[in-house]
Amino acid sequence: MSLRVDYQGGQLEFVADADRLIAAWAGPADADASDQADRIRSALEAPLDFPPLRQVVVPGDRVVIPFDPSLPAASVILGKIATILGEVGVESMIAMIDGRETASRDLAIPTGMTLEIHDPSDRTTLAYLATTEAGRRIYLNRLVADADCVIPVGRLGYDERIGARGPWSVIEPGLGDATYPAVSLLAPLRAKVEGSEEPTEVSRLLGSQFQIAGVPGRSGLLELIAGEASSVQIRGAAALDAAWLFNLDDRADLVIAGIGGPDRLATPADLVAGFRTALRAVNRGGKIALLTDLDLVAIREALRGPTLPGGDLEKALAWADVYLLSKAAADDVEDLGLLAIDRPSQAAKLAASAHSLVTISQADRTRTALLS
């Protein structure tokens, strides 16, 4: 049977025996772009369990919009927000992104809105907000802490550190100074994906009641959910699972996993997430082929950086052999303990000799759950 694995920069197409294929995951459907602008405006005008966006603010409010630039249709969403706020009479609109976010290069800021980049290392930009129930003092960017209204906009996705990313995580840890503990590649699957209690608590302490979350499709924006914060979390968790939860009957001897997608650049964090997804689908002693377009700097940041505990890569490589397609030289890849492949077709050759096979497109956005 014919199979395809999508990743940033390309796709692998090959033929495999159907009796050896356990599952092939392609992700959700492509989003329909024809009515995208109307769907975005509808979400803002008829939100969940909350008045429309235009009734959330009053003229003269200082509005800050913590924003996740990795959200599909990011510039269109910002434009619709700016239009609605401008119609109400809001003149101070600031879009703020985390300076550590690498997906901001194509973000277009609408007229009437300014862009601020948050630098968590600059203590002069931070202000004390409150102390959490666990006793942690919360510091956020001063513009956020002092705003009259904070409307966070985030991409929904799985995040092993906090359960799920979304508008709540754009605020905390996105615009604060906190760092969360590194999570092992081999960590058990988190049972809860609605969002971490602490980022949710910080949103509440800040008074951010109206939040906006986007569900990405295989390409484009699949759904925009706006409204009362807890309602957005609940609806968002269900929508995320409906789009990106991959229920797998059994592990395979070979997993071929694509990192990134045809319309987006992959990041070091995406490599970690996709690697983790593939590990959950492969048998001990099996093989993983990761298809990427990343360079050596990004690969080293992902596998030797602070996002993984010390020695974690070695533990993962003891579970399965890992082949990597990338822009890095073969010697540099192999210095990390991985096996380099320089063409996607080499992953197909691995499939020809595997006893069982799973393929996962855009593995970095996928949550793999074993049913057995």
Model-derived regions, located:
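Short glycine-rich or small-residue beta-strand-to-loop segments that form or flank ligand, phosphate
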Residues: D61-P72, A95-G99, I256-G258
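An acidic, phosphate/nucleotide-engaging active-site surface
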Residues: R105-R165
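Glycine-rich phosphate/diphosphate-binding loops that line cofactor/substrate pockets in enzymes
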Residues: L48-P66, L85-V90, F246-L254, A281-N283, ...
